[in-house]
UniProtKB/Swiss-Prot annotation:
MRNA binds at residues 8, 31, 100-104, 111-115, 121-122. Component of the nuclear cap-binding complex (CBC), a heterodimer composed of Cbp80 and Cbp20 that interacts with m7GpppG-capped RNA. It comes from Ixodes scapularis. Keywords: mRNA processing, mRNA splicing, Nucleus, RNA-binding, RNA-mediated gene silencing. GO terms for molecular function: RNA cap binding. This is Nuclear cap-binding protein subunit 2. Its main location: nucleus.
């Protein structure tokens, strides 16, 4: 039984909607999100290789600082192994964070960089909560120089 596609579509995809759908249905590449900024490539390999042979991991990087920014792409050799990862890894914890996986139409150079104005992920621009696993406050809140909450 194959794993269905989610409703999410990359708005920056270079091509038609039907081409994107076709690539998603054939893809062996996953987008992995909600990762800690401190999760390593080795941890990704260790977790995702439980579902099959991992061909490549591409860590998401801040566009300006070239530091991890909470996402990656995992490419498998087979669709079946990628489907197993979506079935069994999606929604599990890695570095105390519940990660999410989704199909990707295939990694293209340049997509490893965050798309937010500050260089990271867009979702981290507007976050108002303090999240130590994702660099503290969201970028807009951090500009207000708010001290982190006291650790009790």
């Amino acid at each position: 039984m194959s794993v269905d596609l989610s409703s999410y579509r990359d708005q920056h995809f270079k091509g038609s909607r039907s081409e994107q759908e076709r690539l998603l249905r054939l893809s062996t590449t996953l987008y992995v999100g909600n990762m800690s900024f401190y999760t390593t490539e080795e941890q990704i390999y260790e977790l995702f290789s439980k579902c099959g042979d991992v061909k490549k991991v591409i860590m998401g990087l801040d566009r300006f600082h070239k530091t991890p920014c909470g996402f990656c792409f995992v490419e498998y050799y087979t669709r079946e192994d990628a489907e197993n990862a979506i079935r069994y890894v999606n929604g599990t914890k890695l570095d105390d964070r519940i990660i999410r996986t989704d199909w990707d139409a295939g990694f293209v150079e340049g997509r490893q960089f965050g798309r937010g104005k500050s260089g990271g992920q867009v979702r981290d621009e507007y976050r108002t909560d303090y999240d130590s696993g994702r660099g503290g406050y969201g970028k807009l809140m951090a500009q207000r120089v708010v001290p982190p909450p006291a650790v009790v």
